[in-house]
């Protein structure tokens, strides 16, 4: 059974709903002041085509809003936009609330699996702060896991990190038979090739009115940006694999960057004994994103699982 939800702007609980308070951010993280510019309209901003500026903005946002005192990632790793990433977290909280008499389950007993957590660790950092959930992050890149562990340790955060040692697997080797995760989340590689990734970067440069860079700006290593078959293939593989761990996860979810990919994913979902799936739209400024969620448990069983959290 399918359900659909649509929104018009950032989630109401998103701390960035009304934009950035640059005065607060520079007060909390003075290094940001070096990157503040004045726009033609006379407002303060930063140059979003400058990787160092974006990284420093993220450091300020994480410190001011999520109590993350230390956050540093290698230049080549993905530097995510915090507001959009946090939106996903808030909508996931609503997904759980739908099975818990409209109350958002909070606390360490809520288990969340982050597929492809990356060096940036953004979902465990923000989701842990907002709802105190316990996160397990996985990644195929040992260097990313190493950086993520350093961030967690420096901030004295209890985040479980696991390396996925087989690039052909998503859940296998990560989810054990005795595990029960209430959510999985994923920001999948959305390009089908390195050439597509380069073109995507060039489009972003053009939108910012800049000449293209010789490197993949906006951060991101190959495994973060593209995989064979693009996001449709990646998420389809995730759906196929989910059947083997159907009883270990209440809700499987993944971001879907392209609306046109939804139909193919719905067809894949219909090949499996899924009790319910949802497509949730998230409008973030000029960009509209969405995630797909599916569960092998019927609503009554999900409600019972949530009752056991109390």
UniProtKB/Swiss-Prot annotation:
EC number: 2.1.1.181
InterPro entries: METTL16/RlmF, rRNA_lsu_MeTfrase_F, SAM-dependent_MTases_sf
A Pfam family annotated for this UniProt entry: Methyltransf_10
Domain of life the protein comes from: Bacteria
Catalytic activity: adenosine(1618) in 23S rRNA + S-adenosyl-L-methionine = N(6)-methyladenosine(1618) in 23S rRNA + S-adenosyl-L-homocysteine + H(+)
GO cellular-component term (any): cytoplasm
MF-aspect GO terms: 23S rRNA (adenine(1618)-N(6))-methyltransferase activity
Subcellular location, principal: cytoplasm
Nucleotide-binding keyword on record: no
Protein location: Cytoplasm
One GO term (biological process): rRNA base methylation
Keyword tRNA processing: no
Alphabetical UniProt keywords: Cytoplasm, Methyltransferase, rRNA processing, S-adenosyl-L-methionine, Transferase
Role summary: Specifically methylates the adenine in position 1618 of 23S rRNA.
HAMAP family the record matches: 23SrRNA_methyltr_F (MF_01848)
Family stated for the protein in its record: Belongs to the methyltransferase superfamily. METTL16/RlmF family.
Protein's UniProt name: Ribosomal RNA large subunit methyltransferase F
Species per Swiss-Prot/TrEMBL record: Pseudoalteromonas translucida (strain TAC 125)
The encoding gene: rlmF
């Amino acid at each position: 059974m399918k359900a659909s939800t649509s929104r018009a702007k950032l989630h109401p609980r998103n701390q960035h709903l009304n934009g950035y308070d640059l005065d607060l951010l520079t007060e909390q993280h003075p290094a940001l002041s070096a990157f503040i510019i004045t726009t033609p309209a006379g407002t303060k901003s930063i140059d979003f085509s400058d990787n160092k500026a974006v990284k420093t903005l993220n450091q300020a946002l994480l410190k001011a809003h999520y109590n993350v005192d230390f956050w540093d990632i290698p230049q080549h790793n993905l530097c995510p936009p915090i507001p959009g990433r946090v939106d996903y977290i808030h909508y996931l909280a609503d997904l759980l609330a739908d099975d818990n008499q409209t109350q958002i389950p909070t606390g360490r007993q809520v288990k969340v699996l982050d597929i492809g957590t990356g060096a940036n660790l953004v979902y465990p950092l923000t989701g842990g702060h907002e709802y105190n959930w316990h996160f397990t992050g996985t990644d195929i890149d040992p260097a990313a896991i190493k950086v993520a562990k350093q961030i967690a340790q420096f901030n004295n955060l209890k985040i479980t990190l696991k390396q996925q040692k087989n690039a052909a697997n998503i859940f296998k080797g990560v989810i054990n038979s005795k595990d029960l995760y209430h959510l999985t989340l994923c920001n999948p590689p959305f390009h089908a090739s390195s050439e597509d990734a380069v073109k995507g970067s060039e489009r972003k440069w053009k939108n910012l009115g800049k000449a293209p860079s010789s490197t993949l700006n906006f951060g991101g290593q190959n495994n973060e940006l593209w995989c064979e078959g693009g996001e449709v293939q990646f998420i389809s593989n995730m759906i196929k694999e989910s059947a083997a761990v159907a009883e270990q996860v209440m809700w499987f979810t993944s971001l879907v960057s392209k609306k046109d990919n939804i139909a193919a994913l719905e067809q894949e979902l219909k090949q499996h004994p899924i009790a319910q799936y949802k497509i949730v739209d998230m409008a973030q400024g000029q960009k509209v994103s969405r995630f797909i969620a599916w569960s092998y448990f019927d609503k009554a069983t999900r409600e019972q699982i949530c009752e056991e959290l109390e």
